[in-house]
Amino acid sequence: MKKKYSCLFSLLSILFISACNKQLREEPHSILTPEFFATTQGFQRGLDAAYAGTRNLWGTQNLFTMTVIGTDEFYTGKDGNNDINKYNSNYNTSNGTVAAIWKECYTNINTCNGVIEYAPKITGLPDEQKGRNVAEAKFLRANFYFLLVQFWGDVTLNRNFQTAPVTSATRTPLAEVYMTLLSRT
């Protein structure tokens, strides 16, 4: 009897595991879609999201950690990140601190790009408020890029709102990144 149940359980397990052969396709990829930015509330909430992104950078101490690695001001804490005190050069994208800064900056840059790009399409808001929100989004975008270039020099420059995952990137020369940040566009 035990052998029957064991065989039946194994057979059912195999059927359940092999029953789903479709790949999961996430639609939409983010709640920040063009339709979201096209509304007055979405326009303001997009800017709020960009501001909230600064908390994810500074609040987790990732930026602080990256600026003092290799100095005598930073010691291994309870998290056991021994690479910091051993002066190892193991800081690449597989390191959580590095990956988190990179991801957060580009996520927030894309949010700022959405606010900037879809501002002209917003109706029902005074031009003065739209202009102020766009100026704030441009400042935040420039700040996120400034953080990126301080750590990595040449970085990918995204000037438009990305609605789908991007699987390739080209590094933009540092001088061009700075010129873009200083321009009014």
Predicted segment positions?
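Bacterial Sec-dependent N-terminal signal peptides
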Residues: 1-32
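Membrane-proximal, proline-rich intrinsically disordered regions
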Residues: 20-67
